[in-house]
Amino acid sequence: MTKSQRKILVTSALPYANGPIHLGHMLEYIQTDIWSRFQKLRGHECHYICADDAHGTPIMLKAQQMGITPEEMIAQVQKEHQQDFADFNIQFDNFHSTHSEENRILASDIYLKLRDGGYIKTKTISQLYDPEKLMFLPDRFVKGTCPKCKSEDQYGDNCDNCGATYSTTDLINPKSAVSGATPIMKDTEHFFFDLPAFEGMLKEWIQSGSLQQEMANKLNEWFEQGLKQWDISRDAPYFGFEIPDAPGKFFYVWLDAPIGYMGSFKNLCDKRDDLNFDDFWSLDSTAEVYHFIGKDIVYFHSLFWPAMLEGAGIRKPTSVYAHGYVTVNGSKMSKSKGTFIKARTYLDNLDPEYLRYYYAAKLNSRIDDLDLNLEDFAQRVNSDLVGKLVNLASRTAGFISKRFDGKLAKVTDSSLTDIFLAKSEVIAELYETREFGKAMREIMALADIANAYVADAAPWQLVKQDDKQDEAHQVCSNALNLFRILVTYLKPVLPKLAENVEGFLQLTLTWDNLGQDLAGHEIATFKALMQRIEPKSIEAIIDASKENLQATNTDAPKTEAPTQAVNQLELDPISPEISFEDFAKIDLRIARISKAEHIEKANKLLRLELDLGGDTKQVFAGIKSAYAPEDLVGKLTVMVANLAPRTMKFGDSEGMVLAAGPGGKDLFILEPHEGALPGMRVK
């Protein structure tokens, strides 16, 4: 039971209205939808809103290529987006567009408040200009080499490789992505938001608990570099909102995009009499506001957005939750390079509930990347959902219908039910803190208990014995009651399955009625709830996205693993045999890298702090040539935990991390599978 009802507004980042939704996008919407559904299941007032991000030069140029207006294009894309989301059972309370009257009014109002408060500056800048297309080039239409890490083929506003943000004029060897011409410099007057004026407030805010610690650490690095004024204007031609009192100047898309959260909610409030916009957005609001975003847009949501709100006298979000990227079969997805599986391609071949569960089973509260391994995906769904969950009902429901008039018995032994109910607050807390993977493991552990109970009781044998009918009735009724509790726990993740189970059990699944007594309750005839994933369905998705997957796998070293394995054995033969007793002396443990840092004057070593779930060890690892320290923090690895400390000039090294590879850039630390915890022994 919930102690008091909370008022919650939750958002996902706005999908850009110039292309289809892919499975990388779906991670965020599934994550947010699960969290939102959980809050509603617990009885809270929760509103999940979103919108299409519908402004910018990319949309303007693509519409020109299609021979239609930008308005026509974004309307078409929005229809496709909404259908994809609906088919994935994403339950928005409102889905709107940033190209709306609500958003125009709000963006103008916020801008004018910032201007009147002295936070908008104007200055003449030199900007890249396409001499062939006669237009200033927006950030995303200039590509070149990152001025920070020197990675090539990066956009003009931020680097996908190192996460740095910069001005397009800082880009090395820039080229126009519109015409391929080398841009020239041209003067123009632009409007800037005085972000440095909010540095003190932002430093306090990011340490207030509103952000994940990983995000706060990254933002501190940006503070060290110094905050800069933010260019919020673009020159015509541009598809967006014209800036008040500035003909020919338009708001940069990243100014009105986050305001789109407010615009969508305002649209919802205008359609409902029971919702008040100011109850959620006024400075003294006690409602909770949460933004779920990808790690690539942390800078905008954790610096620009709260500073804009502060300057305009509007409340800031309660928390901003970032997640990592999705990879497919171990390889990075890239929308710009076309290496993605479209949501529609998936939906044409598989049940959306499968992906919802798989993502949930791998999600946590950190900013880890999530790998969609298609083989593991099929195995996990078939094992957990079909083999454990649905199987529990399919093995017992038929006996209730055929032998006991479809009515459940009074269960006299409540010991298993008590175990299941005792986990309710544990599972609820895991949902609340976005530790979905841990929640799924708790639920599946209960499913294992229930299936073991049915297997041991063997109702299919009991029903054959006249003197065992009551016992068979008890076992099947108990199993279905446990099944009901399991599906209730999974309702935020598997809403369609839960809906079908509600029809079968002829009751509504709510958190508050987990302990409901079903004695004498009549159920409907059981029908198959879920089918196994067949290899041909996975193959169909691969075939439909073949070009994308092949492009992705081009960068994946493991596609050449068989050849590499042979070559590596020739280069580095297997060592002489050792006894089992010798091997048993080595204590291998799972460790989380809690800190990683460079060592001054050390060419090969990084200093790692390894968390063993109760103890911390310092290790100097010779992996500097292959890893940047910031890429290691938070990762799980395997270490030799009982190696005698080795004194080095930098300090004592108290173990060794395991890595493979010949050296240099070709070093790969070992990472355990999802579910391993710091301190676990590797056997």
From Swiss-Prot:
Database matches in InterPro entries: aa-tRNA-synth_I_CS (IPR001412), Anticodon_Met (IPR041872), Met-tRNA-synth_bsu_C (IPR004495), Met-tRNA_ligase_1 (IPR023458), Met-tRNA_synth (IPR014758), Methionyl/Leucyl_tRNA_Synth (IPR015413), MetRS_core (IPR033911), MetRS_Zn (IPR029038)
The protein's enzyme class: ligase
Gene3D superfamilies (alphabetical): HUPs (3.40.50.620), Isoleucyl-tRNA Synthetase, Domain 1 (1.10.730.10), Methionyl-tRNA synthetase, Zn-domain (2.20.28.20), Nucleic acid-binding proteins (2.40.50.140)
PROSITE patterns according to UniProt: AA_TRNA_LIGASE_I (PS00178), TRBD (PS50886)
Family assignment from sequence similarity: Belongs to the class-I aminoacyl-tRNA synthetase family. MetG type 1 subfamily.
HAMAP family attached to this UniProt entry: Met_tRNA_synth_type1
Record function comment: Is required not only for elongation of protein synthesis but also for the initiation of all mRNA translation through initiator tRNA(fMet) aminoacylation.
Name listed for the protein in its UniProt record: Methionine--tRNA ligase
The species this protein was found in: Shewanella frigidimarina (strain NCIMB 400)
